[in-house]
Swiss-Prot record:
Disruption phenotype: Embryos with CRISPR-induced cirop null are fertile but the developing heart at 48 hours post-fertilization (hpf) show cardiac looping randomization. Only 25% of cirop deficient embryos show a normal positioning of brain, heart and pancreas at 72 hpf. No other ciliopathy-related phenotypes such as body curvature, kidney cysts or hydrocephalus are observed in cirop mutant embryos at 72 hpf. When dand5 is depleted on the left side of cirop null zebrafish embryos, the phenotype is rescued.
Keywords of the record: Developmental protein, Hydrolase, Membrane, Metal-binding, Metalloprotease, Protease, Signal, Transmembrane, Transmembrane helix, Zinc
Extracellular topological intervals: 21-578
Protein's recorded name: Ciliated left-right organizer metallopeptidase
Function per UniProt: Plays an essential role for patterning the left-right axis. Requires solely on the left side, downstream of the leftward flow, but upstream of dand5, a nodal inhibitor involved in left-right patterning.
Needed co-factor(s): Zn(2+)
Length: 623
C-alpha cells in the first residue's frame, strides 16, 4: 500500500493543470433581460442581431464605476472562513474593476425596472387612445422579479401600474416605487451555492448573467453564482488570487463583454465600424471583433500594419452565427477573457480586452493598468492560425513532452485542449509546477538536476545532471533555477551549488559540475515589469482599507425608508463560531479533560466563544 502511495505521489505532478471553465454564453442566453419600459414595448419589433441604428455616445464627465454587491437572503449560510474568502475575493475584484472602468454615473439612486411581460396581461396598442402602449390589465399571479434565480428586493425596483380604462389618466398602482440603491452604477447579486451547474462540471468555479439594462443599453444589474466548493479549495496561499481572477472575468462579462450585448455597443462617431457592424467573418471563416480601439490594440500587440486586424472570437461552443463571449484561445492565450482560465498568476488583464470594453461606448478605460499579454507579441497578423501552429515555435509545441509554460513561471507539459483546435502548447502541470513556490522543492525529486525553487526562480528548458549521477540519459524538460535581471532581456541564473552565471538570451550554457545544457529563453525574462508572481509572503490588502477612494465602496444609507430592508454584514449581536473551530476546540478540551481526570474525577468545562468582524461597507444582506 505504501509503495502504491509513493508511486501516486511521484506521478501526480505530471498531470496537466485542470483549468476553470466559463459557461457564460450558455447561462446568458437562458436569462430574460429587462430593459426600460419604452424599450420593452419596442423589443418585439427589433431584430436583435442587427445594429438597427447608429448611436453617438458622448464620453465626457465619466467617473470610476460604483459596483454594489448584494448578498440575497436565499444564499446558504457560510462558515466564517468561507465568508471571509468570498468577501475578500469579490471585494478585491470590484476594486480592481472600478480602477479600470469609468462610466457616466447614475443620478440619485439606481432603480431597476419591472418586466412588463410578467406583470402585464395586455397593453393598450391603439395609438389614438390616451394610454397608448401602457398596461391595461395585470397578471393575477405576478409576485416578484428575479435575476438568475435570485429574487430582486422590491426596494431595488421601480413601481408598476395598470390603466384599466384606455382614456382614463389615473392608474391603479400594483407595486409602489422602491427607494432604490444609493451610490451605485451597477448592482451585482452574489449567490453562493453548489448548484446543478456547479455539480455538472467541476471545472466551473462561477457563472454570471446580466438581467437589466438601462436606456443606453448598458447593463445595470446581474447575478454571479459562486460554486460553494470553490470556497473550500485551497492549494496554496495564493489560491485567493484564483478567485479574484474568476470574479473579474465574470464581472467583465456582465458589464459588457457579451455577445448578447454586441448590438447595444455604441459608436463614437461617423464611419466607426470598419465592416458596418461590430463583428464579421474573415476569409478563413474566423469570426472577429472589428471595433476601432480593438483593431489598434491588435496591430500594436502583433506588430502588424494590417488595417483590418480584428480580434478573433472563440469558435468552440460558439452559436450558429459564430459569435462567442470569449477570445480565441490560439491567438489570445492567457487573456482574462479566454474561455478557459489557467492559474491566476498566468492570467493577464490585457490591452485588447480593455479595448473591447472601451468600444462598448459605455466606459472610459484606464489603459495604463493593462497587463502585458506576452502571448504572440510581435508575431504578426497570422499568428495562432491552425495552419501555422503545428510547428514548434516560441509559443507552440509538438508531441507530449515536458517543458515550460510560455511565461516561465511554471513547468509545463505539451498538450492540447478543446479550445486549441489541435494546436499544442505548454500548460502548467497540475501539482507543484510553480518554480516561484519554495515549498515545491520536494526532497528527492530530481536532485541531480540542480533545481532551486523560490520567489526569484523561473522555468528553464534543460537536461543538466550532476557529473556523478548514475543516470545515463536525462531528457530535456522544464527545470527551476534562480534568476536575476541585469538589463532588459538580460539575466544571470543560479543552479544548486553554483555561482551566478550569465545566461545570454537565445543561447544555451553549460554549468560546472554538471553535464548537459540550460537553454536561455529570449524575450521572456527581464522584459516585462508586471510579470511577477504572488509569493507565499504576499498578503492581500484589506478590502476595507481606503486603497481606491474612487471605487466608492460605501455602506448603504440607513435612512427610514431603507433601513428595514438593508443591513451590513456581521452587524449582529452574536456571531457563530465556525464548525471547524468548534471541532478543534472540542478536540483540545477532550485531551485536556483526559489529563485532568488523572487528578479529578469530575470536571466541568464551559467554553464561551465570540468573534468580531469589521462591518463590510459594500457587502449587503437582506433581512
Amino acid at each position: 500500500m505504501s509503495f502504491l502511495l509513493c508511486i501516486g505521489i511521484l506521478l501526480l505532478p505530471w498531470f496537466p493543470c485542470v483549468c476553470g471553465k466559463c459557461i457564460f454564453d450558455q447561462i446568458q442566453r437562458s436569462v430574460n433581460v429587462v430593459s426600460p419600459p419604452t424599450a420593452q414595448y419596442a423589443s418585439a419589433y427589433r431584430f436583435k442581431t442587427q445594429r438597427s441604428k447608429r448611436h453617438i455616445m458622448p464620453m465626457d464627465n465619466l467617473q470610476p464605476i460604483r459596483i454594489k454587491i448584494w448578498i440575497p437572503s436565499e444564499s446558504p449560510a457560510l462558515s466564517d472562513w468561507e465568508r471571509e474568502k468570498l468577501m475578500s475575493a469579490v471585494g478585491e475584484a470590484v476594486s480592481e474593476v472600478s480602477s479600470l472602468l469609468s462610466v457616466k454615473r447614475v443620478k440619485d439612486r439606481l432603480l431597476l425596472n419591472r418586466d412588463v411581460n410578467k406583470y402585464c396581461k395586455f397593453i393598450w396598442r391603439n395609438s389614438s387612445t390616451l394610454n397608448h402602449m401602457k398596461c391595461g390589465r395585470a397578471h393575477e399571479n405576478y409576485r416578484f422579479e428575479s435575476c438568475l434565480g435570485v429574487i430582486i428586493p422590491d426596494e431595488h425596483l421601480d413601481g408598476c401600474s395598470v390603466y384599466p380604462n384606455p382614456e382614463h389618466p389615473v392608474p391603479t398602482v400594483l407595486r409602489p416605487r422602491g427607494p432604490g440603491v444609493p451610490d451605485a452604477d451597477f448592482l451585482l447579486y452574489v449567490f453562493t451555492h453548489n448548484t446543478e451547474k456547479c455539480r455538472a462540471e467541476s471545472s466551473v468555479l462561477a457563472y454570471t448573467a446580466h438581467c437589466q439594462t438601462g436606456s443606453d443599453g448598458r447593463p445595470l444589474a446581474g447575478t454571479m453564482v459562486i460554486c460553494r466548493e470553490t470556497l473550500k479549495k485551497e492549494r496554496y496561499t495564493y489560491q485567493h488570487f484564483v478567485k479574484v481572477t474568476t470574479v473579474i472575468h465574470e464581472l467583465f462579462h456582465v458589464l459588457g463583454f457579451s455577445k448578447e450585448l454586441l448590438s447595444n455597443w455604441k459608436d463614437f462617431g461617423v464611419d466607426c465600424w470598419s465592416h458596418g457592424q461590430v463583428t464579421s467573418t474573415d476569409q478563413t471563416g474566423q469570426v472577429r471583433l472589428y471595433s476601432p480601439t480593438v483593431i489598434r490594440a491588435m496591430q500594436k500587440h502583433f506588430n502588424s500594419t494590417h488595417t483590418d486586424l480584428g480580434a478573433p472570437l472563440e469558435n468552440k461552443d460558439a452559436a450558429l452565427d459564430g459569435l462567442s463571449s470569449h477570445w480565441e484561445a490560439r491567438v489570445l492565450q492567457g487573456s482574462i477573457m479566454a474561455a478557459s482560465l489557467v492559474e491566476a498568476s498566468l492570467v493577464r488583464i490585457d490591452a485588447i480586452t480593455l479595448a473591447a470594453l472601451q468600444d462598448t461606448g459605455w466606459y472610459s478605460v484606464n489603459h495604463s493598468r493593462a497587463q502585458s499579454l506576452v502571448w504572440g507579441e510581435g508575431e504578426g497578423s497570422d499568428f495562432g492560425s491552425v495552419s501555422a501552429c503545428h510547428n514548434s515555435s516560441a509559443f507552440f509545441c509538438t508531441g507530449s513532452g515536458l517543458g515550460c509554460h510560455f511565461l516561465h513561471l511554471n513547468k509545463g507539459e505539451c498538450v492540447t485542449d478543446q479550445y486549441l483546435d489541435g494546436c499544442h502548447i505548454f500548460k502548467p502541470l497540475a501539482n507543484a509546477s510553480e518554480c516561484w513556490i519554495e515549498d515545491n522543492a520536494r526532497s528527492g525529486m530530481n536532485e541531480g538536476g540542480g533545481e532551486i525553487f523560490g520567489s526569484d526562480s523561473r522555468c528553464f528548458i534543460s537536461n543538466i545532471t550532476r557529473l556523478n549521477n548514475v543516470t545515463a540519459y536525462t531528457p530535456v524538460s522544464g527545470h527551476c533555477y534562480r534568476h536575476r535581471c541585469t538589463g532588459i532581456n538580460k539575466y544571470h541564473i543560479q543552479v544548486k551549488d553554483s555561482d551566478w552565471m550569465d545566461c545570454p538570451a537565445g543561447t544555451s550554457i553549460e554549468v560546472s559540475g554538471y553535464q548537459g545544457f540550460i537553454f536561455c529563453p529570449e524575450n521572456r525574462l527581464c522584459k516585462y515589469s508586471d510579470l511577477a508572481p504572488p509569493t507565499s509572503t504576499q498578503r492581500t490588502e484589506s478590502l476595507f482599507s481606503d486603497t481606491t477612494a474612487q471605487s466608492d465602496l460605501g455602506m448603504m444609507e440607513k435612512d427610514a425608508a431603507v433601513q428595514p430592508s438593508f443591513t451590513s454584514l456581521f452587524l449582529v449581536s452574536e456571531a457563530k463560531i465556525s464548525l471547524a473551530a468548534v471541532l478543534s476546540l472540542m478536540a483540545v478540551f477532550a485531551l485536556l479533560s483526559a489529563a485532568v481526570l488523572l487528578y479529578r474525577k469530575n470536571l466541568s468545562v464551559r467554553v464561551h466563544a465570540a468573534s468580531y468582524r469589521t462591518p463590510l461597507p459594500h457587502i449587503l444582506y437582506r433581512n
